[in-house]
Curated annotation (Swiss-Prot):
Catalyzed reactions per annotation: N(2)-formyl-N(1)-(5-phospho-beta-D-ribosyl)glycinamide + L-glutamine + ATP + H2O = 2-formamido-N(1)-(5-O-phospho-beta-D-ribosyl)acetamidine + L-glutamate + ADP + phosphate + H(+); L-glutamine + H2O = L-glutamate + NH4(+)
Subcellular location(s) of the protein: Cytoplasm
Organism: Nostoc sp. (strain PCC 7120 / SAG 25.82 / UTEX 2576)
SUPFAM superfamilies: Class I glutamine amidotransferase-like
MF GO annotations: ATP binding; glutaminase activity; phosphoribosylformylglycinamidine synthase activity
Name of the protein this chain belongs to: Phosphoribosylformylglycinamidine synthase subunit PurQ
Pathway: Purine metabolism; IMP biosynthesis via de novo pathway; 5-amino-1-(5-phospho-D-ribosyl)imidazole from N(2)-formyl-N(1)-(5-phospho-D-ribosyl)glycinamide: step 1/2
């Protein structure tokens, strides 16, 4: 399985993600510059965290217009896998690949912490390596991570089983319905505010995030 990690001006988690896919999982991985327009060789595109374009105007608002994003949209429309982490989640909502939006944290402060999450569904490529209802711990680091959607959209997301992760216990940012991560209706696009790549190597204090990536590989092996 070949991974591509998109690099925008201001991205700062791209190498963390590549370390997981290339070094921990041994998968071919290439860094995709924001001006690239050929990603046909990739199976999974990951938009990492950071501050793309300095978060000017609105988080992810400028990044969505980068040349590579049109290719990412087409990649997703073909049913291929796309993962947006933190700022990447914001970019995916701006690009219309995921519903809702990410607004300023309820307390208006930047949050950097480790938080418990409940795995809401394992009927997904992204979460199949977890157990239903499993509580995992992942780092968060964001100032605009409060998931918001209008009532109709929120109901649709819930009814379709698109919520894959919820904050367990205290809601750190005021996200509606404690939402921490959602997928699109097809299930091939995932956006999440917590950072699984920062909890993949036990040396860093936890490996709960590694299963997110391992599940994809297990699916490929099963289909082989």
């Amino acid at each position: 399985m070949k991974f591509g990690v998109v690099v925008f001006p201001g991205s700062n988690c791209d190498r963390d993600v590549a370390y997981v896919t290339r070094d921990l999982l041994g998968q071919p991985t290439r860094m995709v510059w924001h001006q690239d327009t050929d990603i046909a060789d990739l199976d999974v595109v990951i938009i990492p965290g950071g501050f793309s374009y300095g978060d000017y105007l609105r988080c992810g608002a400028i990044a969505r217009f980068s040349p590579v994003m049109q290719q990412v949209v087409e990649h997703a429309q073909k049913g291929k896998l796309v993962l947006g982490i933190c700022n990447g989640f914001q970019v995916l909502t701006e690009a219309g690949l995921l519903p809702g939006a990410l607004a300023r944290n309820q307390d208006l402060h930047f949050i950097c912490d480790r938080v418990p999450l409940t795995v809401e569904s394992t009927n997904s490529l992204w979460t199949q390596a977890y157990n239903p209802g499993e509580v995992i711990t992942l780092p968060i680091a964001h100032g605009e991570g409060r998931f918001y959607a209008d009532e109709a959209t929120l109901s649709e997301i819930e009814d379709n089983g698109q919520v894959l992760f919820r904050y367990a216990g205290e809601n750190p940012n005021g996200s509606l319905n404690n939402i921490a991560g959602i997928c699109d209706r097809q299930g091939n696009v995932l956006g999440m505010m917590p950072h699984p790549e920062r909890a993949s190597d036990p040396v860093l204090g936890g490996s709960d995030g590694l299963k997110l990536f391992q599940g994809l590989l297990e699916k490929v092996v099963a289909l082989a």
